[in-house]
């Protein structure tokens, strides 16, 4: 037997009918136990390498044990716990955290989000808006509805402030008791309209009360012309009719009506339109057929009044200049050794004061030449002395 076994090749079975029991190796079973206890997701161990020639009764018992072992291991494989999902990265992970999944350990992001939500809730409470804000884009979220509401509110407040300031300027509201307003130094930031400064514009009465002709009395013609022109200076219109005649005065009235219907005339600086009486007098001065002598006779009283007003203003300026000069002389201190300069200045000052006193005394003052006449229009001109 030993020889036959030695003559046989490796892996070859003998032809003998003797029962031969092959004992299986213990290594596969031990490995199966180790793997089965260490990992729940393991494959069942197959015994295809073990050959066992036993009796039928023993074989049936072994098969029952193998089936029960197979079922137990299969049940263990089906009851394995679910695999843990990998840690999410990027925006998808943030979405799962927001949707109730695993929380992301982002402390500062949560703090910033809470602050933004508090600020938005405050704005919504102030503005009375309703609705939820879509924060799916988080820091890139832009609430355009809220921005539009804020811009509209800001523009309305700015418009109200402008309207309020404009109303104050238009009505000329001033604080009572202010020193600047009492002294006449206070001024409005915005110039008042012409109607507030000059009243409603005087409109010409084109129809009049009755018709006038060349044969009518000069007083009647002058009164009707003054009424149609709405001119308060009736004496001036009467002198125009008396010097130029009824015909020329009526022609000027017709030209004035035509100019007024076409829009009127501006004054010299263009700040406002002339009144109908101003248009009438302007046409009178610019008519070639009317001589300068006639114009002087018509405006003699007005020119005389204007001259008197200028004369009174000049006298007031001269008196103010004399007071300033006296105050300046009292404040000066001359050196004792400089007798010449003191005497010269005193003599010149006395002459100047004497001339001022003469100018203040009577109306019969002599007219100075153009070279000798010095007119002081402002108190700052004292610096030249």
UniProtKB/Swiss-Prot annotation:
The modification N-acetylalanine is found at residue 2. The keyword Transport applies. Residues 343-352 have a biased composition (Polar residues). One of its GO terms (cellular component) is neuronal cell body. Residues 2-320 are annotated as: Necessary for interaction with CBP80. Belongs to the PHAX family. This is Phosphorylated adapter RNA export protein. It comes from Mus musculus. The lineage of its organism: Eukaryota, Metazoa, Chordata, Craniata, Vertebrata.
């Amino acid at each position: 037997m030993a020889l036959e076994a030695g003559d046989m090749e490796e892996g070859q079975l003998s032809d003998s009918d003797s029962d031969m029991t092959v004992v299986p190796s213990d290594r596969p079973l031990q490995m199966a136990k180790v793997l089965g206890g260490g990992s729940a997701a393991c494959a069942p161990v197959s015994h295809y390498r073990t050959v066992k020639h036993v009796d039928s009764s023993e074989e049936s018992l072994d098969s029952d044990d193998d089936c029960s072992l197979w079922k137990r291991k299969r049940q263990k494989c089906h009851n394995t716990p679910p695999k843990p999902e990998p840690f999410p990265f990027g925006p998808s992970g943030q979405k799962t955290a927001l949707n109730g999944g695993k929380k992301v350990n982002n402390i500062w992001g949560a703090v910033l989000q809470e602050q933004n939500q508090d600020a938005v809730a405050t704005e919504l409470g102030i503005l009375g808006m309703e609705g939820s804000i879509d924060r799916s884009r988080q820091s890139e979220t832009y609430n355009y509805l809220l921005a539009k509401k804020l811009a509209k509110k800001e523009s309305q407040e700015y418009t109200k402030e402008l309207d309020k300031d404009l109303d104050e300027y238009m009505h000329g509201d001033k604080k009572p008791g202010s020193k600047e307003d009492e002294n006449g130094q206070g001024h409005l930031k915005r110039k008042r309209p012409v109607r507030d400064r000059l009243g409603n514009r005087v409109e010409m009465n084109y129809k009049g009360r009755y018709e006038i002709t060349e044969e009518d009395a000069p007083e009647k013609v002058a009164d009707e012309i003054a009424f149609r022109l709405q001119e308060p200076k009736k004496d001036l219109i009467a002198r125009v009719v008396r010097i130029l005649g009824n015909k020329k005065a009526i022609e000027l009235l017709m030209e004035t009506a035509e100019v007024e219907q076409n829009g009127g005339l501006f004054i010299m600086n263009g700040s406002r339109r002339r009144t109908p009486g101003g248009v009438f007098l302007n046409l009178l001065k610019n008519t070639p057929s009317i001589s300068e002598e006639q114009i002087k006779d018509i405006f003699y009283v007005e020119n005389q009044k204007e001259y008197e007003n200028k004369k009174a203003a000049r006298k007031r300026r001269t008196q103010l200049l004399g007071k300033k000069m006296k105050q300046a002389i009292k404040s000066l201190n001359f050196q004792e050794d400089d007798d010449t300069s003191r005497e010269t200045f005193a003599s010149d000052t006395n002459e100047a004061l004497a001339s001022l006193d003469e100018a203040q005394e009577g109306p019969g003052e002599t007219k100075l030449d153009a070279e000798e006449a010095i007119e002081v229009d402002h108190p700052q001109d004292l610096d030249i002395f």
